[in-house]
Amino acid sequence: MIEKRRYFHENPEMTGKEYKTIEYLSAELTALGIEHVVIENGGILATIKGGKDGRAVLLRADVDGLPVQETPDNLKPGMRTCISKNPGVMHACGHDGHMAMLLGAAKILLDKKDEIAGTVYLCFERGEEASGNVEYIFPYIEKNNIQIDTVYGTHLLATAPSGYLAINDGGMMAGAMGFNITIEGAGGHGSRPDQANSPIDCCFVAIYQRLQALRLTKVDPFKTCTYSVGVLQSGNQGNVIPQTLTFGGTMRTFDRDGVGVTFYNELKKAVDGICAAYDCKATYNSYGMPGYAVVNDEEMAQWARKVLAEELGSENVGQWEPWMASESYNQYLQQWPGVFAFLGIQNEEKGIGAAHHNQEFDIDEDVLYKGAAAAATYAIEYLKDDSVKGGRKMTYKQYLEKVANYKLLTKHYGE
């Protein structure tokens, strides 16, 4: 697994461009004798059929890298075991480890194939960082009548101690909403702002002030909500009043239907109203409804902790504070009962502990076997125990209707 992880880490590919990564994964699965299909734009879905008939489990890993220039060292000089060979692209979130662990789980499952009472699907998902490519996987599953009873996924976590597996009774990762908006006023000479209509001076300043006030005036103080502006672009010369200003950011919450929808409505109302007041025009380049948080099924989480504690030791399995980052895996848990797990990688002696998406990010390779063992154990034990819940909660079409993502609904179902 360590060898595989190092290959993935040295050869990261950006979201939506993971062509060589998919080729490599396909070759590895072929070498193992595992049947699989490459889903165009979606990733890979592999199938391991057990020695007995039964239910089905889907195990998932994401595969894409990030536009980050990796530093030669992690938090401790000389401790990196490998580094990206692709300038400006890095596995800075642990997806290299996720792939390696799922391949490791595949080998464990093959070794125990005769005792598997059902089917295990391995899903290697492209484009998780943009949450876009998974939209090709679910329609494939439905159109091919693939029956799944439960899902399991793992994310390496830099804030948890190395080797600690966390499965919460509920929230694991927040839901997200992204926004990117252009404000158009009227440009002019920097010496005569009275003859121009700067999108900066009044319009954006007022929008930003309103944005800061939303948390105080519209968000329940007992609900989690965080947001920030990460993009602000306008003008390129000091004596020219620009015509346009573009700003963008993100909002995160565990209360999508309450806080999330409120934020969506209130920010748009503020932008529209303030632009009208200052005679500016707003263009919503990106403004989608917020996604759902990654929330474990409580019954499944308690069952999973029990069986995985027997495999890994009770001292190594428990719960951990939720993470405000977001994950496309929420879409799996909306459709099927299951769990999402954190596997800690923090190791001060090895210089490992930098935040995800940071240029000094690194993972503790010595924990990969635990992630593989946990995934394989979840699948094997679930298929042994018919008393544990399973089955589809909703179709993908129903999920899209639930999140009001009509663009994707039309794309895949022609409505």
Feature-to-residue mapping (PLM):
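Active-site beta-loop-alpha junctions enriched in small/polar residues
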Residues: 13, 62-64, 127, 157, ...
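Soluble non-cytosolic domains of exported or imported proteins
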Residues: 15-20, 96, 198, 295-298, ...
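Divalent metal-coordination and catalytic microenvironments
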Residues: 8, 29, 46, 59, ...
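Histidine/acidic-residue-rich, glycine-tolerant segments that coordinate divalent metal ions
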Residues: 66, 80-90, 96-97, 109-231, ...
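Acidic/His- and Gly-rich active-site-bordering loop/insert found
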Residues: 1-91, 96, 100-117
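Short, flexible, mixed-charge acidic loops at enzyme active sites
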Residues: 68-80, 170-174, 348-355
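Metal-dependent amide/peptide-bond hydrolase catalytic core
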Residues: 202-415
